[in-house]
């Protein structure tokens, strides 16, 4: 099937979806209605671009006819030639855009995510930087209209983040934040540094798609669940009733502790969300490691320990090492205005995928 047949098939399906979504039987079936609505939303941009592309093709045909019929009218002929030139340029742009829109979609792109941030090398400074990254993602989520919920956090004595786990919910969250997994390096003068020397610290970020129970079922026999009293500052027990939950996936040793909520059931539900995502991610990583290099992530190596980005405070500079992007906008990016970085990563990924398809 060539590209035009593919595009026509997408448009035909889009029109079929429009009819289905007005069918009373579909409307009354909430699950099916949501699935079809999601499919329609995912194809809308492709169909809109394809329809605009067909209009450009028609404009080219009309301009060519006009040039043939304009003999003896230099002004009309010149106008038609100019329109033909502009339309041919637009045709090339649409063809590139449509190739990208037809690229196979990551099945996780529309999912919510579990976001984990940890202070790594650098002690207190690494924990403080992990807090900066948390704020950056929270503010970016606000700009996207997403819901950002901190599910579990652990702070150190200077107010930094040793570890934080958050759920980010909304439209196409994974598609935009999936490139954030890896080691984030910071270069700055710590507040405790009297000599003004720049220190280098690292925080790690892990982005995992939320996994529904129907998608990945964990055998209850593979889980060990411990219930204990939640602890407050200084280690004192803050609840008379044991509400905190420790959940261990025995085959992998993956462990989750949850005590943020006031009830045991809510802590258990949140712990289950996280452990399901972590276990699914664990086995997905094993599968990815078994694939050849071409089938690994095109942005970076896919190695979770890979240094992906450096934040240099003295020079107000952010560098993404995977795509060679450097921006003198560190303050802007840390305030949540991440679109320039994320758009560049998406474009790079799409370009590499196109190249691999053409080879």
Curated annotation (Swiss-Prot):
Methylated by PrmC. Methylation increases the termination efficiency of RF1. It holds the Pfam family PCRF. GO terms for molecular function: translation release factor activity, codon specific. Keywords: Cytoplasm, Methylation, Protein biosynthesis. The modification N5-methylglutamine is found at residue 236. It is found in: Cytoplasm. Gene3D superfamilies: 3.30.160.20, 3.30.70.1660, 6.10.140.1950. GO terms for cellular component: cytoplasm. The keyword Repeat does not apply. The keyword Protein biosynthesis applies. Coiled coil: none annotated. Its main location: cytoplasm. Belongs to the prokaryotic/mitochondrial release factor family. Peptide chain release factor 1 directs the termination of translation in response to the peptide chain termination codons UAG and UAA. NCBIfam families: prfA, PRK00591.1. This is Peptide chain release factor 1. It comes from Streptococcus pyogenes serotype M6 (strain ATCC BAA-946 / MGAS10394). The lineage of its organism: Bacteria, Bacillati, Bacillota, Bacilli, Lactobacillales.
């Amino acid at each position: 099937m060539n590209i035009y047949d593919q595009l026509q098939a997408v448009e035909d399906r889009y029109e079929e979806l429009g009819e289905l979504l007005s069918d009373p039987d579909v409307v009354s079936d909430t699950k099916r209605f949501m699935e079809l609505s999601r499919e329609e939303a995912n194809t809308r941009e492709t169909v809109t671009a394809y329809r605009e592309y067909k209009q450009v093709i028609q404009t080219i045909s009309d301009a060519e006819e006009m040039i043939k019929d304009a003999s003896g009218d230099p002004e009309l002929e010149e106008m038609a030639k100019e329109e033909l030139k502009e339309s041919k340029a637009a045709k090339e742009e649409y063809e590139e855009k449509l190739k990208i829109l037809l690229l196979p979609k990551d099945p996780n792109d529309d999912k919510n995510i579990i976001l984990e941030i940890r202070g790594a090398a650098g002690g207190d400074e690494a924990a403080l930087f992990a807090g900066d990254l948390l704020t950056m993602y929270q503010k970016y989520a606000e700009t996207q209209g997403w819901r950002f919920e901190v599910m579990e956090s652990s702070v150190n004595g200077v107010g930094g983040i040793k570890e934080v786990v958050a759920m980010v919910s909304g439209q196409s969250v994974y598609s935009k934040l999936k490139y954030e997994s890896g080691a984030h390096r910071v270069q700055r003068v710590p507040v405790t540094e009297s000599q003004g020397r720049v220190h280098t610290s690292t925080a790690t970020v892990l982005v995992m798609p939320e996994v529904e129970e129907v998608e990945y079922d964990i055998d209850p026999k593979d889980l060990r669940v411990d219930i204990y009293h939640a602890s407050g500052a200084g280690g004192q027990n803050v609840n008379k009733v044991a509400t905190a939950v420790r959940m261990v996936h025995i085959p992998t040793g993956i462990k989750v502790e949850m005590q943020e909520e006031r009830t045991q059931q809510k802590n258990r539900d949140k712990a289950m969300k996280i452990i399901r995502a972590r276990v699914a991610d664990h086995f997905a990583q094993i599968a990815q490691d078994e694939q050849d290099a071409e089938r690994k992530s095109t942005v970076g190596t896919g190695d979770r320990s890979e240094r992906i980005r450096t934040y240099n405070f003295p020079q107000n500079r952010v560098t993404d090492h995977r795509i060679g992007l450097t921006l003198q906008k560190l303050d802007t990016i840390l305030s949540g205005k991440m679109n320039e970085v994320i758009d560049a990563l998406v474009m790079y990924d799409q370009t590499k995928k196109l190249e691999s398809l053409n080879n």
